[in-house]
Every structure is written in structure tokens, then in C-alpha cells.
Amino acid sequence: MMSAGGTYISTASVEVPQALQDGEKFIRWDDDSGTGTPVTMRVDAKGFFLYWVDQNNELDILDIATIRDVRTGQYAKRPKDNKLRQIVTLGPQDTLEEKTVTVCHGSDFVNMTFVNFCCTRRDIAQLWTDGLIKLAYSLAQLNGSAIMFLQKAHTKLCLQVDKSGRIPVKNIIKLFAQNKEDRKRVEKALDVTGLPSGKVDSISVSKFQFEDFYNLYKYLTQRSEVERLFDSIVGNSKRKCMSIAQLVEFLNKTQRDPRLNEILYPYANPARAKELIQQYEPNKFNAQKGQLSLDGFLRYLMGDDNPIMAPSKLDLCDDMDQPMSHYFINSSHNTYLTGHQLTGKSSVEIYRQCLLAGCRCVELDFWNGRTEEPVIVHGYTFVPEIFAKDVLEAIAESAFKTSEYPVILSFENHCNPRQQAKIANYCREIFGDMLLDKPLDSHPLEPNMDLPPPAMLRRKIIIKNKKKHHHHHHHHHHKKPAQVGTPAANNKLTTANSVDAKAAQQVGLSASHEDGGVTRSTANGDVATGTGTGSAAGTAGHAPPLQQIRQSSKDSTGSSDSDSSSEDESLPNTTPNLPSGNEPPPEKAQKETEAGAEISALVNYVQPIHFSSFENAEKKNRCYEMSSFDEKQATTLLKERPIEFVNYNKHQLSRVYPAGTRFDSSNFMPQLFWNAGCQLVALNFQTLDLAMQLNLGIFEYNARSGYLLKPEFMRRSDRRLDPFAESTVDGIIAGTVSITVLSGQFLTDKRANTFVEVDMYGLPADTVRKKFRTKTVRDNGMNPLYDEEPFVFKKVVLPELASIRIAAYEEGGKLIGHRVLPVIGLCPGYRHVNLRSEVGQPIALASLFLCVVVKDYVPDDLSNFAEALANPIKYQSELEKRDIQLSVLTDEAEALGSADEDLSKSFVFVQVGGQKKELRPVESLATSPKHRPSISAAAAMSVDVTVDRTDGGRGEDSISIVAPSIQHQHSLDQSVSTSIRQVESSQFDVDLVLAEPLEKILDHKSVKEKRLEMEKKLESLRKKHDKEKIKIAGQKSSPLEGKKPKFAITNKLVKRLSNKSLNCLSPHSEPGVEIPACPLDLGDSSEESAAADAGEDLAGGSSSLDGRTQESRLRSACREYTSQYRELQEKYHEAIYSAAEKVLKTSQTGQTKQLKASLDKVTGEVMHQLQEARRNEVKNLATVHRDRDELIRMKREVASSVVERGVAERVRLKQTFDRRTDELQKQHDSVRNALAEHRSKARQILDKEAESRSCVSSNGFLVLFHGPHHHGCTGSGSSALSGNNLTLNLDAGAAGSHSAISPAKSHNSIAAAAEMKT
């Protein structure tokens, strides 16, 4: 029996009680047949099978490994039929329940089969109950060697005898093969090993000992790879036997873990080698001489002394006296569900199954029951309800059968105060001493105080529910609405997938009755109708109306944990009183109600609050407060604040649950959040996808306690761990793992093509997926030889958090079996790995033969340099880098999970232009890899998707996806299907919005206005300086007053240069870039002035002096002009591009809103179409079906079908919206980058032009240069245009005219004019 305070889990060798071997008389019964059958029930000597024989000698056999639970007494099944109860009642003593043994078995957590047996006495029933469940949860049996599983197969053959007590040969053939060719192989092997091989032959049990079966196994598998290994060890020995010295060397160099301490784990010595030879060598002569033959060597490799995992890892190996926040805790999400989030079923049984599997945190979603009995139901869906009391009783009965460590009940409470009080009373009555209703004296609820350790909370149930804080009502009730503790005000994280929630809400409303009543599934599947009135507390609305789909547990980030735990936070979330007859707003309807005093009194160490910030949590340091995040919010925190997230989880609990879009109850990869130290990573246990397989594999260790101690760097406050670390962390010894897949044995009884994949999960730097895969061995599931090169995981940064998953697949992608093995505890050397099913049960004889090498990581010379060259990710921004790192755990999670199933189910025919092109997965057309929700509902319907593609004017391709449709055998199919096809046509698709190009942005009115304003200012400045220069040129500089000026312009340049002939680009600037405006600046430098002065040779002394004086004044005016011109240019350069950026931002924001408006519009049209289809169908049904019950049933089907189809359409439109949003965002980014590049180039051009322009005089001319080669330019007394240079005549001739320069720019052209009249 289970000892007090103990569990049925054990790592000890199996000992089957003699009473179970001898057998006992029972009456087997089931309610379906209504009959009771006397049987004799037994267990074989090795504890593999439970079997019973009836009076006709008919045998039934049950694999004990598939047994999930065994019950007697209060929780055993009881016959419903009175007559059957009388038949099965034996003996006058004890009640029927106390004499009943109910055996529960199944291949997953949902589909359970119950077998019931009644005996004569209570003690007999108790003995069998305890004995069977202890065998079922024996870790020694679960992790047995390859030899043990051979013994199990042999035992089954020996039990399945015919009426004459002999073993039919056909049973042996059937065990190994189904295919005709493989059956011939088995028949030949039987013949060669001296056994009967005919199909109708049989074998005496006494002549079919285990040795005979083992010889048959050897012949079928050949094991040539083991023979090669053996030869490499013994060399050219004539006897082909391994000596003691050779065995010692093999044990120490190949089979020993080099990471182990030599004192605690000493090397093998000759004495140890002799023990192994004595144990495994079948030839006594060899054993006496200390020699090991090939047969003995194979037996050792398959034996108990050569496990793949260190036996200590299976036992309770972790320190259980650390604070609870230092452990990963096996957690379940939406525990009550057994399938789909919208249309699945609820179950009391699955609570038992999750707890028995080691789950230590389950979720209960309470709602008001119609009969004043609180119920558990998935709010606002078609999922039927179950009574809360039944669930609490199931938890009390199963919580500590397989683990004695504390269980957390995560309440999501929507009940009114009266029913909340009833729940609290049930908890006290049903749980009794197991309920932790007050904190421990050693760990008070105070800041800076750690949580108690699991060891102190053995066999305790902890309630997680909102905590009532009375002082909030007195201090904050006068605050403005914006200050009230709503998610928008208090929480920086928003509830994910509001679009999907709104979608589901509208679908639900569309399925409601015309008169305002709302349909709701009840426990027995009927649909109840109600007005749905009442406040948020639910005082009138007893059960949740079908208004909207609850997206997920809103523990903190949504609305459920709106109570804060201190005065510095805000009010509990309450709903204002509503006018009579009005329903609360949908977004309020799903919120949790305020915690009642009775249930609040039960809450202590797990108090959910809104998450505000890591800084706030660190400042308060209340370890008893915890927050919950959906997977998207947690991923955001992980990417943006990884180190802070890890530090937060050192002291406080955090719960991460699947996003609300996972209607099919799929899971995210839990490794993603284990990397951040999140303790309660909650998964949908009903879905055995890749994520759940990994979860089950990891929590199998530490005695399946449900608690795994986190690595030291995730616990110590004085240590820092970055989950995105790529290099070795100081203080952590990195590891290297190498795995060679050599062969497989009996992977499948089909003649299949098989391959093996080896993946590693851990930190992003350690995670390797879909990289290592063996070749495909064709037509051989019996003994495939892979003999691959080693799969090397060169550097494992954090081995304590890393695990290996080895999986065998059929060529089509169907999972054969897998195994999850933590790197810490992995045994090196040549090892057999027995494969498991998705739920973690052993698969008959299926095993892989591996060569494993584990060692500490030693970097190669210059490895860091080589890594930097080969890994450009290091030079990206941190967020981009983390996105890429996380992709190995997020992008492919759902795709890989579906690969474990038959891939043919995930593929559909794709038609392009009316022709069948190829077979392609649905997701590849439905969504982008980055946002790929796993929606099986969408795949369960007939969906036509039209994809518009602009392709050089070649028109559009219509892509039709044909998936399995929901099977409804009434006219709804036709009407709604027609409606769906209309809804899904292109006219109801989300509009395609294209980003405005840069040219349109720069051509916008506000940008043009700025450009025109600049041109006017520059023109005004030019005119001002023209006047100044004319004034200077007209002043008398010579003592010869009264004479005509001697300066006369000899050439007049009035040619205006258009933008095409002369723009502001320098000779070295890039073509095609125009800046808004740039004047012809007249640069000046001392060198240029000196060169000009040296080069001038003006005729006459007085006139020469006058010319120089006048030129210096002109040059001074030119400098002032150039300076002011440049200032204006700088000012408007910024103004023009700021205006362009504003236009761009406004345009892009408007386009995003336009896309969202398009989604809302088309969604409304979709809902309208569905509602119209439903109304029409209901009218049609009323005319066709006269039977009232049939009519009600058909209406239910209509409502259910519309909801499912509506959700699928919502999902499709949302996916299209997300895809087009992503595309639009990329276009926006491209335009923003183009504008920035345009701005930068314009700046470069301005700077180059400023440097290259100059104003010098040469041979009587003032030359305005635009290029850097002006020193070689000469004038000849005439106007010239050479390249970008303007030459103006300034010669002081007899005409005596004054000179002036007039550079100007108007409307993107440069005009230079100089004119003076005498």
C-alpha cells in the first residue's frame, strides 16, 4: 500500500506481490453490456501485464504501462443498473464501492477506457488497487533496458496461448511484421533457430524460453554494427573474445562520463569487469576464463548496466529545500478542456490524468451555475460545463498519488459572492488538512521574504485567486476613470489578439436567438436560452452567455488580476451598475469578479497582480505576488528585457500561457520561457504536440515530482545570466555533445522507409533543430542501419538547461517514436534508447543504437575570430539579433509539432487557374511564418482562398484550397457553404494598400510651399545684394571726377540655365538626386584672393588701383552675400525635409488606418452574410422538420456550424490583414529609408557645392567656378560657359562701364545676368 505521506512512484526494482501473481476471483462488469462476467485476474511475475480469464478460458490482457489510474472506494465506478448491481455484489460485508476495483487505461490524457472488477472483500480490492498503480508508475519499468523490453514481448507471447496451452506461430510473426516480405523473414528466422515456422504451427511454452526468443531477435536484427565495434576492440584475436583489460579500457575510455568526479565515481577496475562478464557472458567456459564473447558483449550493451540516462536522474535528485521560485513547475492551461477551445468538451477526468502525470498547477475557470452550484466551463463557448465540486473532489483524490509536492490551483473566478463563498467552503471541506489556508510561521507574507520550499509544502494545495484588499475602497474611489486600475491604465502590456476576441464575440452574437436570448451549451449537451441580463458580478446571469470567446487566462495582463496588492496601486476592477435589462459590455463581461472575503482568505503565497514593471517588482520585493503573461507578451519581455526577466523569476513566480488564437489547443515551445526562468509554463495537456512531448520528457526526471530545480545562475541574486548569451558564461562550464545514430531495431512492423532526427533544445544559442537527420533507409522498419557521421553540438553554453530529442520518423513525416534526454545525466558510450509514444509510454521493441560523446567544451584556436566572421548576427542590433535567435523556438514550433502526425492530414490540393498544380501545406498559403497560429478549425472546413497577384499585367491567379469540410448532413451545408463561398470571394477580401512613393511625398503641397518660400527668400536676398553691388560698381574710385566711368561691361550674360542644363549637382555627385534649392554661392578664401590678386594685370596706375579697391569691396559684399545665402539654404534644407517627414508620417498612419478600416468593413460583411445564412436556414428547418426535438437539435447544429465557420473566416481575414500589414510596413520602411537617404545625399551635395564654388578675377574677369579645377581656367574678355563655370567680363576698358554680378536662382534654374548702361 502507499505509505502515509508517500506516493506510488518508485525507482526500485519491481516486485510483484505474490497474491497478484496467484490471482483472485472477480466479477468483471461494464455498463454498456449490462452483464457481469466471473473472471480470475492475475499479474505476471515481472509485472508487465494484467490479464484475466473467464469461465470459457477466454483471455483478456492489458499492458500495465498503459494504466493511468486504479481506484477503489468512493471514486470507483458503480453500476448504474440496479440489476447489474445485484449481480456483481459478492459477500455480505463492505459496500459495493469498497469491493470494486476500477482500472483506467488509455494512450493519452483524454480518451480513457474503464474496466471494472468486483471482489468479495474490501482488503482484496485495496491490495490490487495499490499493487497495480505502483506497477503502472514504476520508473524502473518505464526506463527499462532493451533486454527488459524483449522479456516483456516474450512474456506477452507466453500469455497469449491457445486453448491447448501452446503459442501460435502466427502470434510471433504478427509481433514482428505485417508486410508479406517481412513475414517471410520471420518465418525463415524461426526455421533457422530451430522453431516451428508454419502459419498454423504452434510452440510449447516450455520449448520457447527467453533464450529461444533472444536467438530469434539476434537473427532478425543481425547487429552487424555491434560486431564491427566488437572487432575494433578485440583486434585480431583468434578466439574473438574480449579480455578483462580490454573491457576495462572500453568502460573507462568509451562508456565513462569524463565530467564525473573521480572520487565519487571511480574508474572501472578488473573486479568490475569480472562482475559484468559473470553477469552477461552466456558461455560458462568463457566466463570462468574472464573473457567476453560477442554474444555477451551484445547482452551487456542491451542490459540494465548500460542505460542511456544516469539512474540518479530518475530518482529525487534535486534539492527540494530551495524557495518555490527556484523551480520549473509542471503546469496545465485550460485543464478542464479535452479538445478544441470553442467546440470541445470539458472533463472532470482530465484533472485526475494531469495530476497523475506530474502536473502541479491546474486551472479552474469558475462561473455561476444555474442551480446555485458553481460550475467550471470555458466562458462564452459551446464547451459544456462541469460541476466545480466534482472537480475539487477529483483533485483531492488524485493530487498526491504520484507526487507529494504542492499543487497550485489557478482559479479564474467569475462567480458572484454567494457562489464564491460556496467554492471556498468546498475547498475547506474537501481538501481538509491538505489546504494551505494560511502562511507558514517561518515564511510570513512580508517583503524581502522568500517563498517556502516545496519540501515544507508536501501534500499541500495552494490557492491562486485574486486577493481582496479592503483599503482600496476607501482611498481611490473618487479618482478619475483614467486612474482606475484598468489594464490600459495599470499595465504596459496589452491583452493580445483583441481582434480575435472581438471576432469570436460577434460570431457568438450572430448565433444568438432573434429575441435577444443567448444559446449556451449545458453539461449534457443541450442548449439553454437566457436573456443574459445581469451585472459583471453575474448575480442574474448564472452561466456565461455565448457573447465572446475567452481568449485565455487573464491572470494579470488582461483583466482578471485587477486587484493590486498595495495602496500604491489601483482599485479592483469593477463594472458600473447597468440599467435593468442591459448586458454588460462584451469587454467587461469576460472579466473576473471581485474576490469574496471567504475565498480571499484562502490565498497566501500565490497572489496574482497586474505586472507593471521589473523595477516596481524589485522595489516592492514581494515574493508572494506573481503575474501571468500570454506567450506574445512574455516573448516581448524576453526580447526587450531578458536579464531583468531572469532576475524577476529568481524571486517571484510567473505564469506563461498559450495565446488566445490557439483555438485548436496547440502549444508554444515551453523551452522559450524556461530560458527566462519562468516557473509556470502552462500547456494544453490534451494536445500531445511537440511542445507537450518535450514537457513530458523533461518532467519525467526528478522522480516525476513536477518540480525541477533551475540552473544555479537562474537562482542566485549575485549572478547574472543573459538568455541570449552566445559565448561561454563565466562560472558555467560549456559542454560538447556528439551523437552518432548507428541503427534501429523494430521501429515499426510495417515495411516503411525510416529516418532519425536529432535536435537540441536549450538557450537560443544551444538550440539546434532540423539540422541533423540521417539518411532514409528504405523498406526496412525491422533493423535499419544508418551508420551516420556524428552529429556534433560543438558548444552547449548552458548544459543544465539543454536537452536532446531523438525521434524516428517514417518517410512521410509520421512520428514513430521519440525520446527526450537532458544533457546533464546523458551517459556517453554505445547505448540503446527505447522510444516513447507522444504521451511518453514505451513503444514495444522500438529502440535506437547510438554512440554518444559528452565532454567539456574546449574552444579551438582563433575560434572567436572565425565565429565573428561566420556569424554576422553579432553585428546586428540586439532586438533583431534576439528575434533571429528566438526563431528556432518560435517560427517552426507549430510546423514541427504537426510533423509528428501524419503529414498527409496537413496537406491540401492547390489549384491555380483551374489546374491542379501541386500538394502544399495549408499554412504556406494562409499565413506568414512569423505569425503562424495553429488553427485546426480552419483546416476542418471547406475554404476557398483567392489570392490576387499583380504580375506584369498577366492578370490574377485564383488559388483554391480544398480542405476536409465539416460533416453536417442537412441543408445547412448548401446554404451556408454558398454563403461562405461568397464571403471568401475577392470582393470580400481585405483591401490591398500600397505605400505612397517618395516622389509623391516630395511633391506634396506643404513641401512645395516650403520650397517656394525658400526660393522667394533667396530671390529677395539676391536682389538686395545686386543693388549693393551696382552701388559699389558705380562709386567713383578715381580722382578724375566728372568723367564718365571707364568701366564698361564688354559682355552681357542673360542666359538662364534650366534645371536640365545646370542643376545644383557637383561633378562628383550621384545622378538623379535633386535638392530643393541651392544658390550659386560665391565662395571666398585667402588662397583664392591671393591667386586672384597675383593674376590680375590691370592697365594704368590709377585705374589699376581703382580696380583693385573696387574689386575688394565687391569681394567683401560677395562674402556677406554668400554667408547669408548659405544660412537660408541650411534653414530651409531642414524645414523642407521636416515637412516631408511630417507628410510621410501622416500618409503612413492614414494607410494603416485604412487597412484596419478595410478589415472591419469586410468583417462586418462576413458576419452579415453568415447571419443571413443562419436565418434562412432556420426558416427552412422550420418548414422541413415537424418534430420539435429534431428541430431543436438541427438549430443547435446550425448555430454551432455558423460559429465555427465564422471563426474560421475571422482567422482567415485576420491572417490576410496581418500579412498585408507586414507588407505595408515593409513598404513604409523602404520609403522612410529612401527619404533619409535622399536627405543625406542632398546634404552631401550642398557641402560639396559650398566647397567647390569660388569667385576670382582673372585677366579682368570675375570668374564664378562650380568645380574644383578653376585654377586652370582663363578668360578672354568675353562671356563664356564652360562646364559649371560662369565667366563675367570685368575688364576696365575705355568704355568705363561699371561691372556687376547677379547670380540668381528661380524655379530650379540658375540665372546669371550682368548689365550696366553708361
UniProtKB/Swiss-Prot annotation:
Q: Name one GO biological process term.
A: G protein-coupled receptor signaling pathway
Stretches of Basic and acidic residues bias are at 585-594
Q: What is any one of the record's Gene Ontology cellular component terms?
A: cytoplasm
Q: Where is the composition biased (Polar residues)?
A: 571-580
The residues covered by the C2 domain are 715-843
Describe tissue expression: Expressed in neuronal cell bodies of the optic lobe, central brain, and thoracic ganglia in adults, and the brain of larvae.
PI-PLC Y-box domain: which residues?
599-715
E.C. number: 3.1.4.11
Q: What catalytic activity does the UniProt entry give for this protein?
A: a 1,2-diacyl-sn-glycero-3-phospho-(1D-myo-inositol-4,5-bisphosphate) + H2O = 1D-myo-inositol 1,4,5-trisphosphate + a 1,2-diacyl-sn-glycerol + H(+)
Q: Which Pfam families match?
A: C2, PH_14, PI-PLC-X, PI-PLC-Y, PLCB1-4-like_EFh
Query: What name does this protein carry?
Result: 1-phosphatidylinositol 4,5-bisphosphate phosphodiesterase classes I and II
Q: Which organism is it from?
A: Drosophila melanogaster
Gene designation per UniProt: Plc21C
